[in-house]
Amino acid sequence: MLKVGDKLPEFKLTATVDMDINKAFTEITHVSYPGKWLILFFWPKDFTFVCPTEIVAFNELNGKFKESNAVLLGGSTDNEFVHRAWRQYNKDLNDLSFPMLSDIKRELCSDLGIL
């Protein structure tokens, strides 16, 4: 399990970043945010009933993270299309200000010791 300050494993994942279908997805890697701290959090699956509460709470803290030179990244093993559909379905997730990573191969989750 990684601790604060440990080197993040290399990764390249598709992320859902916008509700506009023309700007909805982008690729994010371990070097996408040079000079920034990365805060990663994961949830078990999209469309679960408790997870939106925690996701919204992280979103509400995102301004504080940015003030601290940190970038917030959330994710699960669902694909980017499921992330977007969940955001459309659940109004509380419509305006998230951080990328939702899609780790469908479970590589980053495994490297981080989450799975």
Where are these regions (language model features)?
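Chalcogenol-based redox active-site neighborhoods
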Residues: 1-115
